[in-house]
Amino acid sequence: RPALRGLIDLTPQRVNTVSLATKEVLRDLRAEEAEVEFHVFRGEFGGVPRDDRHAQEMAIRRKLLDLTGMLLRRYAAIGGESVKVVHHDAYQDPAAYREAAQAFTYTAADTESLIVAVRQKGKERRFRKLSMVSDLAVIDMGGNTPTGAPGGRPALPILKDFQGEKAISSALKGLLVQGNPVVYVLKGQSV
């Protein structure tokens, strides 16, 4: 019975499931003929890990790139032709990489970043830069506390949650708001 059919997302952290609100935003942007671009910048991982902690951090960064890639494919499927996903690689096309990095103020210090850009009809492109490590994920860095055993090693970082949809959709909605926020400061007034 077609009415009872449904998809069950068994991927880690439900990365292939997007909320109804996200679907509506992407469909509205497509209806407005707005251009949505996602630019993925990958930082350097740097060869062989120094220790277990560094190896775990590298594994988390790779996992975040994979999860973000899967989520962006879903966004592209929903948004259709209005959504474009671009993966920038400094080694494959250095000139295009440099040009995009300058356009979006990306630096090597930003490591893995996702740029969410929107160009509405008749308006200039607006963008927001998101860090995959701090904006799209909840990571328990474990601190430098030993594991409890005598001579124990420091606890390793753990990827607790991937919040890619929340951050990306929030950035999209924020880019659609027109005008600059205004703050009024009153001096000498009692409340």
Residue ranges and their predicted role:
Residues 1-191:
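Short, surface-exposed patches at the edges or C-terminal ends of soluble domains, predominantly
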